[in-house]
C-alpha cells in the first residue's frame, strides 16, 4: 500500500513541470521575439511580404552587409531581397533622407546641420549594427613585424610633417626594425566617409592643433599637396597594395581580407599600451565607451550612438567605431516591416555571430537589448 501511494505521489510530482510548461502557452502566446531581445523569430521572417529593400552608405560595414543580405533572403524564403551599395557614409545618409534609399548606413551619426535639413516633423533612428576598427595599413617592403604608432605620430604622418619611413620618430618607436629610406605617401578617402570621421575624431583627441586645422568631419580639410585621395575603402586599400611607401586608414576587415594580407600597425592607447586591432581589443573599447555619457555632438543628439575612439582601459584599441543603420522613424507598410525585421535579425545573436566571422566585434548584449526596444518605436 505504501509503495502504491509513493508511486502515485512521484507521478504527480513529476507531472507538475509539464503542467506549468503547458500553461505557459495558455491565453496570449509568449513571443519568441520578446521586446528588447533583438532576436528575430524565424516564422515571423517567413511571413513577411515580398519586397525589395535598397540601402546605401558606409563601406566600413559593406562586407557584413553582403553576408547578411544573402542570409536574409534564405531566412525569408526568398521574399525579401536587399540591395546594398557602398557609396560612403555621407552619400548613404543623403539618399536615405531624400527617400531614395530605404535605409542608409553611416559610421558617424547625423549632425545637427543634417538633422535641421530633414522634412518638418520627421524623425530618424540610429541603430548600431557592428563594432569595428580603423587601422593604419601600410606597404613597406622588407618589414614583416607590425609597426608601432602613436596618435601624435599618425598626425605628423598624415599632415606631411614626417615624410620618410626612416624618420627618427618612427625609428624610436620601433627599435630593431630596419626602416627603409622611402618616401611616405598618405592615402585619404576622396568621398565623404565615416571611416575618415572615426580616424579624424581620434586624431583630434590626441592633437588639439589637428582639430583646429584639419577638423573632425567625414570630409576634413587635409593639407594640400600631401598624399593622394582615393574613393571608398576598396580604393584606399587597393592603392596601398600597389604603392610602396603608402599608408592609409581602412576598416580592419579590408586589411585582413586583402589578397596580399595587408600589414597594419598597433596604436598606443590612452593607458599607454601598444594595442593591435582584434576582436578582443575592439570589444574592450566598446565596453568601456558604453559606460560613458555621450556629451559630444553628433553622438549626444541620438539614442544608442556611442563614440568609441580613445577609450579608457589597458586592452582597448583606440581607433574603434560603430556603424549605424539610419532610417526614418515613420515607415510605410510592408517595406517598413521588412527593414525593421532585417535590422532586428542582423543585431540578433545569429546576425552578430556572422559579423564576428568577418572580423567585426559583436555588439555587447546590453546594447542589443536596447536596440530591440528602439526598433519597437519605429512606426
Locations of regions flagged by a protein language model:
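Residue-level signal for mature regions of secreted extracellular proteins and peptides
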Residues: 16-19
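Flexible loop/hinge segments at secondary-structure junctions
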Residues: 26-379
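C-terminal motif of bacterial Sec signal peptides marking the signal peptidase cleavage site
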Residues: 21-25
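Bacterial N-terminal signal peptides that target proteins for export
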Residues: 1-13
Amino acid at each position: 500500500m505504501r509503495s502504491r501511494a509513493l508511486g502515485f505521489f512521484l507521478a504527480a510530482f513529476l507531472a507538475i513541470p509539464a503542467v506549468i510548461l503547458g500553461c505557459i502557452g495558455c491565453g496570449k502566446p509568449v513571443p519568441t521575439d520578446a521586446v528588447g531581445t533583438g532576436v528575430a523569430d524565424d516564422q515571423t521572417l517567413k511571413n513577411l511580404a515580398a519586397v525589395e529593400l535598397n540601402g546605401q552608405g558606409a563601406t566600413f560595414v559593406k562586407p557584413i552587409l553582403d553576408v547578411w543580405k544573402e542570409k536574409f533572403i534564405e531566412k525569408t524564403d526568398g521574399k525579401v531581397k536587399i540591395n546594398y551599395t557602398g557609396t560612403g557614409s555621407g552619400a548613404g545618409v543623403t539618399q536615405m533622407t531624400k527617400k531614395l534609399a530605404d535605409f542608409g548606413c553611416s559610421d558617424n551619426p547625423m549632425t545637427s546641420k543634417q538633422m535641421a535639413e530633414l522634412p518638418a516633423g520627421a524623425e530618424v533612428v540610429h541603430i548600431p549594427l557592428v563594432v569595428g576598427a580603423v587601422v593604419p595599413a601600410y606597404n613597406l617592403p622588407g618589414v614583416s613585424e607590425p609597426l608601432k604608432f602613436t596618435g601624435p605620430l599618425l598626425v605628423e604622418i598624415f599632415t606631411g610633417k614626417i615624410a620618410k619611413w626612416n624618420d627618427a620618430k618612427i625609428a624610436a618607436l620601433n627599435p630593431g626594425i630596419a626602416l627603409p629610406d622611402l618616401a611616405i605617401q598618405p592615402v585619404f578617402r576622396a568621398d565623404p566617409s565615416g571611416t575618415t570621421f572615426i580616424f579624424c575624431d581620434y586624431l583630434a583627441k590626441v592633437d588639439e592643433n589637428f582639430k583646429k586645422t584639419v577638423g573632425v568631419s567625414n570630409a576634413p580639410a587635409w593639407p594640400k599637396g600631401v598624399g593622394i585621395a582615393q574613393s571608398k575603402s576598396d580604393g584606399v586599400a587597393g592603392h596601398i597594395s600597389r604603392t610602396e611607401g603608402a599608408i592609409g586608414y581602412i576598416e580592419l576587415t579590408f586589411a585582413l581580407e586583402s589578397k596580399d594580407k595587408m600589414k597594419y600597425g598597433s596604436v598606443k592607447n590612452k593607458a599607454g599600451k601598444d594595442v593591435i586591432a582584434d576582436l578582443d581589443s575592439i570589444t574592450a573599447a566598446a565596453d568601456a565607451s558604453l559606460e560613458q555619457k555621450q556629451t559630444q555632438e553628433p553622438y549626444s543628439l541620438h539614442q544608442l550612438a556611442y563614440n568609441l575612439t580613445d577609450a579608457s582601459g589597458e586592452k582597448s584599441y583606440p581607433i574603434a567605431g560603430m556603424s549605424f543603420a539610419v532610417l526614418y522613424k515613420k515607415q510605410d507598410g510592408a517595406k517598413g516591416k521588412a527593414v525593421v525585421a532585417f535590422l532586428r535579425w542582423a543585431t540578433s545573436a545569429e546576425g552578430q555571430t556572422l559579423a564576428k566571422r568577418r572580423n567585426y566585434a559583436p555588439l555587447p548584449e546590453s546594447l542589443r537589448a536596447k536596440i530591440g526596444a528602439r526598433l519597437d518605436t519605429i512606426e
